[in-house]
């Protein structure tokens, strides 16, 4: 399975992090923290760690616990799905297109579809913990997923690496891939 580039397939990616949800399949109503499925470091293209609550019976959204180490950040990325991060612990800021937004524990961060974004941990000593909720399962079921990672760069650098394509807007012709330029 390709983790990036032209051979990347979102179905393969999601299949590595959680079971495929089937209606009527027995799944737990409660998933304990110790049962989260950690993604191997090679599947996360940035210094964050992700653990998925993949056994929950969700058909349209995915739940992750995401950790950003002190002084680190996620990669600059964009994707067709919407994402909400609930800040469990820590403080930092996010670049979402041309906006810089500060946040702290208890806040929610919304990332609209197909917007360049990167999340930063502003502490030199404390990790950031997010509960990340994204509707990627729904878009996968509809066959319209797409992700791009520009690596550890600015929004301007990401835009230069990935010029806008008219068909790359959600709701138009899908081009499933993950193009990693890290």
PLM feature segments, named:
Residues 1-60, 148-182:
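A short, N-terminal "cap"/entry segment at the start of jelly-roll beta-barrel domains
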Residues 74-76, 94-95, 111, 117-124, ...:
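Short beta-strand His + acidic residue motifs that chelate non-heme Fe in jelly-roll/DSBH
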Residues 54-58, 74-81, 100-101, 115, ...:
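Short, low-complexity cationic-aromatic patches
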Residues 98-114:
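Short acidic-glycine-tyrosine-enriched beta hairpin
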Residues 47-49, 62-79, 113:
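Conserved short histidine dyad/triad with adjacent acidic residue
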Residues 65-69, 78-96, 133-136:
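Short, conserved beta-strand element in jelly-roll/cupin
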Residues 60-63, 84-86, 110, 125-144:
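A short hydrophobic beta-strand segment most commonly corresponding to one strand
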């Amino acid at each position: 399975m390709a983790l990036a580039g032209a051979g990347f397939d979102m179905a393969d990616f999601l299949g590595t992090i959680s079971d495929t949800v089937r209606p009527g399949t027995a799944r737990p109503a409660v998933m304990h923290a110790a049962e989260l499925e950690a993604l191997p470091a090679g599947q996360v293209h940035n210094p964050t760690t992700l653990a998925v609550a993949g056994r929950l019976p969700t058909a349209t959204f995915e739940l992750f616990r995401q950790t950003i180490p002190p002084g680190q950040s996620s990669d600059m990325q964009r994707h067709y799905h919407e994402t909400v991060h609930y800040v469990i612990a820590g403080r930092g800021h996010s670049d979402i297109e041309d906006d810089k937004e500060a946040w702290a524990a208890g806040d929610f961060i919304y990332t609209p579809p197909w917007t360049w974004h990167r999340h930063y941990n502003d502490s030199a000593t404390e990790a950031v913990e997010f509960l990340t909720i994204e509707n990627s399962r729904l878009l996968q079921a509809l066959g319209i997923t797409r992700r791009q990672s520009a690596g550890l760069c600015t929004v301007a650098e990401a835009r230069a690496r990935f010029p806008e394509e008219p068909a790359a807007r959600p709701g138009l012709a899908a081009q499933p891939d993950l193009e990693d330029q890290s």
